[in-house]
A protein has these predicted regions:
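N-terminal signal peptide c-region/cleavage motif recognized by signal peptidases
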Residues: 14-18
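N- and C-terminal low-complexity/disordered segments
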Residues: 2-8, 19-131
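Low-complexity, intrinsically disordered tandem-repeat tracts enriched in small/polar residues
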Residues: 9-13
């Protein structure tokens, strides 16, 4: 048993990079999200320019960064760091979500809200079509 522990300790100390890989990404100026108003069943695709605030219903959405994996990487992935708040008249914005959203796994970091669903569909350049 001690030999097995020693082998695992050796591997953990001298080969830590074997457990993960750094994937190169490219910054994109626009995050593309899909928004659902559960009360009216309205679905809308919204383009969020990085650093700008966009309104959807009572929500304010800000994309702080949007990144895609390079085209030669498989599978392709889009990820965005989003900040979403609920705007209440005469009060401060109530934070609803702050964190990374991934286009390939929307349930991984979902926004919990009784009226709205927001999920990332991709990132894009101004001239590129939505992915």
């Amino acid at each position: 048993m001690r030999k097995l522990f020693a082998v695992f300790a050796f591997l953990a100390v001298f080969f830590p990079a074997a457990s993960y890989a750094i994937v190169p990404t490219q910054e994109q100026p626009i995050a593309v999200v899909r928004a659902l108003d559960k009360m009216t069943a309205r679905v809308e695709e919204i383009e969020l320019p990085v650093g700008k605030t966009v309104q959807f219903g009572t929500l304010s959405l800000i994309a702080h960064t949007c990144r895609i994996t390079l085209p030669e990487e498989t599978p392709p992935e889009s990820a965005a760091y989003l900040e979403i708040g609920e705007v209440k008249p005469g009060a401060k914005d109530i934070p609803v979500f702050q964190g990374w959203m991934f286009a390939s796994s929307p349930a991984l970091s979902a926004m919990e809200h009784p009226v709205y669903d927001i999920w990332l569909t991709g990132c894009k350049d101004k001239a590129a079509p939505t992915k």
